[in-house]
Amino acid sequence: MQMNFTLSGKEIAFDIAHCTVAGWTGRDAHAIQHHIDELAAIGVKPPSSVPLYYRTASGMVTQQDRIEVVGKGTSGEIEPFLIASDGVLYLGLASDHTDRELEAHSVALSKQICEKPVAKEIWRFDEVADHIEQIEMRSWISEQDGDDWVLYQEGTIASIRPLSDLIDGSGLMSSAPAGKASVMLCGTLGAKGGVRPAKRFKMALHDPVLGRTIEHSYAINELPEIA
């Protein structure tokens, strides 16, 4: 799947052939258990081990500002987004938007059913590698049409397992053939007030060292759930 991004003000194209969603990637055992508990509260079974790497169709990645979902039981979550292409690594921003009702039945299936919104801007990973864990992640939600934004998630990449471990564990650098790209969503932070649906989702990845920010927001259009 061909997708264009913005790198240092210039457009760069990737042919995405392989997409992975890493789950249960919290570095702190208590943080992992917190995420397990908040998902258990909505019926999701605990993982068999941590972390886990879920394959999804590459066509699920989208830069649109609106996604369509079935029913009212979906929600987004901010995640670092990695692109590996021809031996070069890039960092971006994504939301692992997930059907929580389906997740209670199968996490793997729930990862496949919703599009994964990603920001258009990316950075070269080697530009941030020496301060990667200082990079800040925040998301906000608007639960109903017309509502103000409410802070939903907040933390740094240091809350997630080292990205180098996730890269190695997933085989990211070697998973796509020459000339193609592999991408990975790298895990999330706990939600303030618990996991819940919203009408709009906004997220930001801020580099306090180089003074720059990647942002993206999208609306969620709920399609009727017909039985």
Question: PLM features: residue spans?
Answer:
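Glycine-rich anion-binding loop/nest that anchors nucleotide
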Residues: 185-189
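Loop/turn positions that initiate beta-strands
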Residues: 180-184
